[in-house]
Amino acid sequence: MSGGSADYNSREHGGPEGMDPDGVIESNWNEIVDNFDDMNLKESLLRGIYAYGFEKPSAIQQRAIIPCIKGYDVIAQAQSGTGKTATFAISILQQLEIEFKETQALVLAPTRELAQQIQKVILALGDYMGATCHACIGGTNVRNEMQKLQAEAPHIVVGTPGRVFDMLNRRYLSPKWIKMFVLDEADGMLSRGFKDQIYEIFQKLNTSIQVVLLSATMPTDVLEVTKKFMRDPIRILVKKEELTLEGIKQFYINVEREEWKLDTLCDLYETLTITQAVIFLNTRRKVDWLTEKMHARDFTVSALHGDMDQKERDVIMREFRSGSSRVLITTDLLARGIDVQQVSLVINYDLPTNRENYIHRIGRGGRFGRKGVAINFVTEEDKRILRDIETFYNTTVEEMPMNVADLI
């Protein structure tokens, strides 16, 4: 192993190897390259990176792209908003043999939206190379998909575990030339019950395959995957300080009772001439309920959740991305799949039930130095959760000031 530190397997504390008790991995790779030009990337890929608007690699890109390109198995612990999608997109594109029209990389993601988001990033970065990428997701026509995959194998397939397994199983997707396997948001996939499908997909791939795993948290089921399927992985931790709560102003509003949240939201609407906002709730049913209530009061809002069919979800996301719909009400399912540049306001109508989702929700707001505002509605019962979030992220959430509109 080159590049890793000498105490590669030292264990100074209990818990699984390379982990500290807080479920945070310990890095064993110290090389940092802080400039895309110094990464020995193909000229056409560099053009794509700069055309996409990247100027300087983010913390995770500075650390993880090189070991990925060198072919190491890599575990990267990083949240959304850190530039992780581009990290593995660049690594895959650099290793592609473009003239060879076979599928050479496979990416798994927990939701359709995230899979499509990843596909967009890969196609944009690989634009000058002529890279092809197909999104393999449920909710779309299976027959069309088979025809597409058979007509010409895409260089890269990105998809949700269920549909990808289906395509491998029916032999429409050939594992023969796949040399790189990426699991994005592994914690999200395992918590959604995709474990069996992921294990079955591994069984179908070459044993020599390079595995790259990205995860915001490292629960035991994720560690189990790394132990079972990865060889001497490079471990890279993007520490919390480097994450995107920086630049996001976080506030709370005391709402004495749950039923007063609706009025609070409507009051905010009038105060804030918002560019675009996402409102998070904890259940699909509540999303429908709030959407109806807002419509009844003549506020224009769109709703998005996992019970909707794919076409409907696509239309709503398109309207929101283009700015023709300005307020999106949704659940955590989509916190991971929405990357909308203009969102400057996130409202947690419900505080997330687990604190990891907090950064998934508001890490959207201030991407890479863009400013953003997060407003949390807090009832008496929620105060403890909010304090827990503050401690976990080492951050402070202040009471919302009167002039909040000026901050957005």
Swiss-Prot record:
eIF4F is a multi-subunit complex, the composition of which varies with external and internal environmental conditions. It is composed of at least EIF4A, EIF4E and EIF4G1/EIFFG3. Interacts with EIF4E. May interact with NOM1. Residues 65-236 form the Helicase ATP-binding domain. Belongs to the DEAD box helicase family. eIF4A subfamily. A motif (DEAD box) lies at residues 183-186. SMART domains: DEXDc (SM00487), HELICc (SM00490). GO terms for molecular function: ATP binding; ATP hydrolysis activity; RNA binding; RNA helicase activity; translation initiation factor activity. This is Eukaryotic initiation factor 4A-II. Its EC number is 3.6.4.13. Residues 247-408 form the Helicase C-terminal domain. ATP-dependent RNA helicase which is a subunit of the eIF4F complex involved in cap recognition and is required for mRNA binding to ribosome. In the current model of translation initiation, eIF4A unwinds RNA secondary structures in the 5'-UTR of mRNAs which is necessary to allow efficient binding of the small ribosomal subunit, and subsequent scanning for the initiator codon. It catalyses: ATP + H2O = ADP + phosphate + H(+). It comes from the Eukaryota. ATP binds at Q77, A78, Q79, S80, G81, T82, G83, K84. Keywords: ATP-binding, Helicase, Hydrolase, Initiation factor, Nucleotide-binding, Phosphoprotein, Protein biosynthesis, RNA-binding. The keyword Isomerase does not apply. A motif (Q motif) lies at residues 34-62. The modification Phosphothreonine is found at T160. Residues 1-22 are annotated as: Disordered. The keyword Hydrolase applies.
